[in-house]
Amino acid sequence: MKKIEAIIKPFKLDEVKEALHEVGIKGITVTEAKGFGRQKGHTELYRGAEYVVDFLPKVKIEVVMEDNLVERAVEAIQQAAHTGRIGDGKIFVTTIEEAIRIRTGERGPDAI
């Protein structure tokens, strides 16, 4: 099993969710996040004072799947989240040793 974590622009969430559904992903976890990388921040004026806004709003998507779905899921996220501009995000793929459904006690792929 693998876990995909994707950090994307918030306005791309619906497109990414739909793209993942089309490749057979049935459930995702979404977390609002803030961060910066190459995109960096920007300066805003508030009541005559300048403020540097370092952290920009992002969305983190987490999904665990069987190994055979990983490449299709990564491609779906890349295509749906792509704008061609700095700040499109990142995708991380990690190995999951075990998954357990708390309600039933199911383990492994049956738990996801």
Residue ranges and their predicted role:
Residues 1-112:
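Positively charged, small/polar-rich N-terminal and surface patches that mediate targeting and assembly
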